[in-house]
Amino acid sequence: VDFNVPIKDGRITDSNRIQATLPSIQAVLDNGAKSLVLMSHLGRPDGRRDEKSSLRPVAEQLQTLLGRPVTFLEDCVGPEIESACADPAPGSVFLLENLRFHPEEEGAGVDESGNKFKPSQEQVQTFRDSLTRLGDVYINDAFGTAHRAHSSMAGINLPQRAAGYLMGKELEYFSRALENPNRPLLVIMGGAKVSDKIQLINNLLDNCNEMIIAGGMAFTFKKVLDNLEIGNSLFDEAGAKIVQGIIDKAAERHVQIHLPTDFVCGDKFETGCNVQTYSGNIPEGFMGLDIGPELQEAMAQAIQRAETIVWNGPPGVFEIPEFRAGSERFFREIVAATRDRRVVSIVGGGDTAAFAKTMGDESDVISHISTGGGASDP
């Protein structure tokens, strides 16, 4: 399951991902499973135990939502965990501790000195074998991590395997919208790094008619393509090497790419900072944290042309009020198109879905808000 939920001071601030898995969990229990072992990650602890990333609060919340006991286990592998899951009382529900406390889950970690390392193949296999011994049937309902080649996704060797209800719902919606969409298909891309989204961008360039590139990744595009001075804005060294290839593919596929021409900038990454809007070069000491009014207008026109819209990644740092306007404009234009013209609108990616939820009841107008993070990167 994907229980990667926001936790502040030990309290879950948004339980949507937990609630989204309840139909699958209830179906397993109602259909005679002797026990249910749930596993998930939370945050990015880099292969080390970190109490701030413990799933214990999730177990407590899940117990309340299910109305039945949920046993929280202090680890996810090893003899003690295997013993606890081997012959439990009928109807038992277990939640394992965060899979990412072990570097073998992601195949990489960071030691206490801050140095990156990789566990051996033997260590990874031992970890996978222990997870495999915890059950008889493997059900994947973690749409938010389904795109990752992690041990819990790709390394559990059980012959009986199935997709959960949430996974099925997400896959059905994305395939219906992207394999045979009403056109034009507009993709709005945000996010910090080009290199993190290269596979997504390449996949979508095969299907879409227009693409808006905003968010932190836009600065890498602008610096590479236009030699723009970007001040203290985010720059992705790895992503810079693939920018031209993306532009070339877009031209080859006749996809119109929209990049920002103006930016709302701050001298600090915090509310109350000095805010300036720059069209063109950004001076040293300032960083771009939202799109300016010029791209907002171009984006509004693209949305008015579209019949299907996929939005993945906010264009600005919406958590800071001064840099929220671009995200709100995107959202309201998409809501209007969905409501007034029956456009199919899909909001995907953890940050984008979180932003949509902050807009209250208006978010109900969106055709589909995905529970996935990077996995809703089709």
UniProtKB/Swiss-Prot annotation:
(2R)-3-phosphoglycerate binds at V1, D2, F3, N4, N16, R17, S40, H41, G43, R44, L99, R100, H147, R148. It catalyses: (2R)-3-phosphoglycerate + ATP = (2R)-3-phospho-glyceroyl phosphate + ADP. Gene3D superfamilies: Phosphoglycerate kinase, N-terminal domain (3.40.50.1260). Its EC number is 2.7.2.3. It is an enzyme of class 2 (transferase). Its cofactor is Mg(2+). GO terms for biological process: gluconeogenesis; glycolytic process. Signal peptide: none annotated. CDP binds at G191, D196, G215, G313, F318. One of its GO terms (cellular component) is cytosol. Keywords: ATP-binding, Glycolysis, Kinase, Magnesium, Metal-binding, Nucleotide-binding, Transferase. ATP binds at A192, K197, G216, G288, E319, D351, T352. GO terms for molecular function: ADP binding; ATP binding; metal ion binding; phosphoglycerate kinase activity. ADP binds at G191, G215, F318. AMP binds at A192, K193, K197, G216, G288, E319. Pathway: Carbohydrate degradation; glycolysis; pyruvate from D-glyceraldehyde 3-phosphate: step 2/5. Mg(2+) binds at A192, D196, D351. CDD domains: Phosphoglycerate_kinase (cd00318). Belongs to the phosphoglycerate kinase family. Monomer. This is Phosphoglycerate kinase. It comes from Condylostoma magnum. The gene is PGK.
